[in-house]
Every structure is written in structure tokens, then in C-alpha cells.
Amino acid sequence: MNLNASMFGQAISFVIFVWLCMKYVWPPLVKLLDERRAEIAQGLEQTEKAAQELELAKANGEALLTEARSKAQAIINQGKQRQEQMVAEAVDLANQEKARIVAEGKAEVESERSKVRQELKDEMADLVIESASKLINRNLDSSANRDLVNRFINEM
């Protein structure tokens, strides 16, 4: 029965082959598989970490964007407020200038009125004296007549 001896030899060869594989081939394969498993786990961990960082960056970006928008709105509001203040100041200044010009105009009108009144009084006095002189056909004392006419005009 060569078949048994051959089978026995094959079994011993198989056991030796398995032992050699376990001793020299299997440990490097297990090591490679463990390293690959560790790399995959590390890659998954890094992917999760990157996803978390991305979410955090999005949240920070949204917060920064919201803050920037609020600051921009505050600057716009401040600009509008300053504009309103400047317009109010310009209106006040224009009103003051208008009041000054009106006051100067009134003063000038009053001055002109007084001047014209005085000129009219003087001219009226001259005309009255001249008329009176022609009526009585003689030349009266002009200073006495002028005083008399001025007193008469002032009583009016």
C-alpha cells in the first residue's frame, strides 16, 4: 500500500509546509494586514476629523459672516445718522444765515427809510419856506423859518 505511505508523506509535507508558512509567511502577512487595517482606521479617523473641522469652519465662517454683516449694518446706520446730523447742521446754519440776512435787510430798510424821511423833511422844509417866501413876496430869515417848519413837521 503505497498509497498510505504516499499519503503519509504528503501529510508530513503538508504539515511541514503549514509549519513553514506559519513561521515565515504568515507573520509578515498578518503584519501587512494589521498595518493596512491601521491605515484604513487612521484614514477613516482623519476623514471624520476633517468633516468635523469642515463643519467647525462652516460654523465659524457663518459666525464671521454674520458678524461682518452686523458691523456693516452698524457702519451704514452710523453713516446715515451722521448724514442726518450733517443735514440738520446745514439746515440750522442756513436758518441762521437767513435770519442774519433778514435782520441786515430790515436794518438796511429802516436805515434807508430814516434817511429818506430826513431827506423828505429837509426838502419839504425847503419847499414850504420857498412857497411861503413867494406868497409873502419877501425873503424871511431862513434859519428862523427852518426852525418853525421843522417844529411844524415834527408835530405831524
Swiss-Prot record:
Instruction: Kindly state which keywords UniProt assigns to this record, in alphabetical order.
Output: ATP synthesis, Cell inner membrane, Cell membrane, CF(0), Hydrogen ion transport, Ion transport, Membrane, Transmembrane, Transmembrane helix, Transport
- Gene Ontology CC: one annotated term: plasma membrane
- Where does the UniProt annotation locate this protein? Cell inner membrane
Q: Per UniProt, what is the membrane topology?
A: Single-pass membrane protein
Q: Main subcellular localization, coarse class?
A: membrane
Molecular function via GO: proton-transporting ATP synthase activity, rotational mechanism; proton-transporting ATPase activity, rotational mechanism
Transmembrane helix as UniProt keyword: yes
Q: Transmembrane segments in this chain: where?
A: 6-26
The UniProt entry, under Gene3D superfamilies, shows: F1F0 ATP synthase subunit B, membrane domain (1.20.5.620)
Q: Which PANTHER family match?
A: ATP SYNTHASE SUBUNIT B, ATP SYNTHASE SUBUNIT B', CHLOROPLASTIC
What is the protein's known function? F(1)F(0) ATP synthase produces ATP from ADP in the presence of a proton or sodium gradient. F-type ATPases consist of two structural domains, F(1) containing the extramembraneous catalytic core and F(0) containing the membrane proton channel, linked together by a central stalk and a peripheral stalk. During catalysis, ATP synthesis in the catalytic domain of F(1) is coupled via a rotary mechanism of the central stalk subunits to proton translocation. Component of the F(0) channel, it forms part of the peripheral stalk, linking F(1) to F(0).
Family (UniProt)? Belongs to the ATPase B chain family.
What is the protein named?
A: ATP synthase subunit b 2
Its gene name is atpF2
